[in-house]
Amino acid sequence: MNLQPITDLLKALNSGNTTTIQQAEQLYADYKNHQPDQLVNSFIVLIRTSQDELLRSYPPVLLRTLVNGNDSGNILKGLKPETLVTLKTELMFAVREEPKNHIRHSILNVIAILAIQLVPEQKWPEILSFIIESSSSPEENLRESSFYLIGAIIDDSRVAETLAPHFDKFALLVEKGLNDPSAKVQVSALETVSTFIDANPEKAEVFKPLIPAMLNTIQKTIESNLEKEAQKGILTFIIIAQYHSDWFKTNFDMIFKVFFQFLEHQSLEDETKHACLHFFLTFAEFKSSIMKKKLYLEPIVLLLLKWMSSVEDMDLKDWNSLDTEPSDDDDSNVAFEAIEALSHCVSKGLWEFFLQCAPTLLNSGNWKERYTGLMTLSSISEGCEKQIKTNFKLIIQSILPLANDSHPRVRFAFFYCLGSFASYLKREMQDLYKTLIPVSLEHLNDPFPRVTISNCEFLTLFLDEIKPNRVKEFKDQFLGRLSPLLQNENYKIVQHSLNAFSSVVDGIGEEFTQHYSEIMPFLIKILRTQTSVETKTLRGRAIETISLVGLAVGKKVFLNDCIQIIQYVSSLEKFKDDDPQVDFFLRAFTRFAQCLGEDFIPYLKYSMSPLMDAINGKVDSSVENGEDFSDESNNSGSIVMENKAMALEMVSIYAMELKHHLFPYVEQLYKGSIELVDFPFSSLVAIQAVNLIPFLVKISKQHFEAVGGLKDGMKAEFTSRLFLDSYERMAASIKTESEPDTLSAKLKALSDLMDIGGQCEQADRILSLTFEVANESFGTLQELETEYQENIDEEDEDADESPEREIIDDAYNSLAMVLGEVCIQFKEKAVPYIATVLPAMIELIETAPSVEIKTSMICILDDLIENGGQKAFELYPHIIKPMMNCTLPNLDPSLIQSAVFGIGLAAENGKDYFTPFLMESLQLINNVIVSVNSVQEQDDDLIAARDNAISAMGRIITNLPQHLGNNFPQTIALWLSYLPIQDDGEAGSIIKSLCTLIRDFSQQIMTQQYIVKVLEIIAVGLHKKAVNPDDKQIISLALRSQESLVAQSLFQLSAENQAILANFFKN
């Protein structure tokens, strides 16, 4: 074989000369397309025989792309059978004989890619024999290569499925590798275990007995000073902790001793120690019942506190110049994040132990320990929120003296800690405003800017959503202390004090008008003059404050300045997509719109252009391709994505404020946002795009009604087309969505679209699509639920529910909104479709692990009963019993509330269809009322459950009186004895039921026995504004007909109720 042409080709590709490389690439393409067999055979010969390292190393790299099944240049199927046989055979020989490690690994990569395509099709049985033989080779490199190959090929799902019956044989092979005399081979064998777990977690169970040998391997590598190899082994343990934490139950004591010893080892690399810590954190997440034991938790927490206390003792001048605390991956910062992670897994045990350590830390003579105490409180403030609340005032009292600490980094940590509390314990913090605001104000003039900035950040968080009267109480002090900071020569102080100042203005509101003329020129000056790269954020804060001041003082005061600011900003050169100012300016313009209302419409063009730019901003290609990229490009890509999400959110606000005036931009906005509903790099971008879509359809509908003169804007061709396209694309997107929070947003958007579209002309198409989505969503949510349940540590009775629980519940609720909206819009036409998913709904009502899911499913039944007509009533035998089973007094009050409400609706709407369930339902409802009334301390949920039960009883009595027979009088007496109710939500239903009885059964109701109770119920209903005009007429006629009885009974009412009725009679 003449190898010269291929040799010349390879040398040309490596020449470094652009022209030569381009010519060589064209020649290479010709070989691929027209002479693939010659190309492959030549590569094989060079790999096997060339003495030139370059000519041996380059062919495997090119072969990898030539045979890659995912590559468009794949030539595998075009090769002659004999070429393929040669390729397979010679590659295996090459691995055995290649002396250079990097070339051998390139050849192994080619074998792996080839095996991934051929093994599932049973076209390379020899490869398994090759792997097994290589694992017993006297050559260390070949033994290591065998395990590398196992890991590489088993990682493919098709190969894993094909080889699953042989996992037990692989386990024996791995066991052999773990006992190999070579540490390199041992670690390679250990690493394959994680690949088997990834490929098939259930079948991987055969590797569980190897845990002691795996741990022994890691120990040996540490003893042999092979830390990089040890780190690979620890990573495998982390993966096992994620997927199979149960594997460690019997061996955890041994694992803990080994890994904790590594943590304490002073001479080990940080990467090794941090990997061990990562293992403990992962294990705590999935097996908190073990990790929370004092034997394990307390030594780790003590070590972490020690690490945190090792914070760098840097020069205060240098520290003061930093934007944030030092964030290197040193022990101190790693410990801070680790304690935060632990607080979410073992909050109770962590808090109890920290309480023992806290006094020593907070009162230490060493500033680093005081700093550690405060920073630890900050890091656990979210995870231990429940525990902190029970000790909150005591905690604040214990740390308050540290506001005056002699060391500035402790004072910094004090305000940093308060800021964390303000984020996660907002109500508790704001209730202490009389204590905390003066402390903050007193220290706003700290000589160290970092402390002042930390204080300002705390104030900003603390004042968020605070009651305005609490801010107004300190208005003069706030303005007096913050105003000088706005003039500070340190732009960072100005920037953060502006943020706090904005929060103060937001709280003061219209009362800030008297200060408007003082502050607005100053803010405008910052906007116009602070144009350097360093002060971009300051400038952003300035326009943010301007917009918040505008909202506070109102359009009349702000209008002229607002218009001038809009015109000035619009004259500026366009910001780059990744400019941090974009966020501030776009949000400010949205507030301008909120302040000016329709007066903003002439300036809408100025804000829509940058919004569209942000929505369409290009994400760095390295992000899109999932490549490694620099911190700079990472930050740039993040800013672009944040701006996309923010711009989409802002357009939604414009839509709410300006409604049909936004119509000229609908088509362009729709085109930009619909492409982002499946945005793969940021769920927030996808969710905001999804949220915007229904608004755009609604704007179009409003436009054709307000401007086009149509009674129903949905009948406009443009709106109809927009609606159907968005519905179809949203439905298609939902079918492939697997993230619960994004799925929830998409389902809610589908519900909103249906609400806007109503009973559109494409009803059959919409119904068909909706139930395709519903069936798919039930399946997806069940998979997510199963995955969630598998990760719960059932042995930990103290475990808090993870955030995933709420996310899944929200997704079910969004699905319920879709199905409920179907019932509301399509009424009887929807019932046959609902019947197809009814078994899934009933199963969830009966077996779902979450009250919220059960309640969501009952809500669908409520909408079905209320809107489905006779076809829905015919389903009563299937749906009433499950609701009745949810009324047992020992169940969650919110579930009972939804169930009794549904039963009342069923009686009211279905009447005769409800008869078979009548007496049992009444008994169950009465049991609910009696049970709640027996509880001495009733919370809002219990009261709502009881009052809904009382309301349901009234619906049953008034709609099925003839079916109660002899029980009718005593049932009325019982119902009246439970009235009036406290829950405002059911007051209207109670009045409606009472008025029905007054109208139809006056002789039984308007009697000496009940008149006082009737008058009391009416007075309460009037006070709650729950009496509609028709009911008022019924009441008026009834009371006039019994004028003397009413007059005799009024004095038995409270003075308040007498006054209410007197006013009613007067009017």
Curated annotation (Swiss-Prot):
Provide the species name: Dictyostelium discoideum (Social amoeba)
Q: Which GO terms describe its biological process?
A: protein import into nucleus
Task: Please indicate if the UniProt record lists Transport as a keyword.
Answer: yes
**Listed GO MF terms:** nuclear import signal receptor activity; nuclear localization sequence binding
Stated family: Belongs to the importin beta family. Importin beta-3 subfamily.
Predominant subcellular localization, coarse grouping:
cytoplasm
Pfam families the record matches: HEAT (PF02985), Importin_rep_4 (PF18808)
Q: Which GO terms describe its cellular component?
A: cytoplasm; nucleus
As for what it does, the entry says: Functions in nuclear protein import as nuclear transport receptor. Serves as receptor for nuclear localization signals (NLS) in cargo substrates.
Give its localization: Cytoplasm; Nucleus
Query: What are the UniProt keywords, alphabetically?
Result: Cytoplasm, Nucleus, Protein transport, Repeat, Transport
The UniProt entry, under SUPFAM superfamilies, shows: ARM repeat
Q: What is this protein called?
A: Probable importin-5 homolog
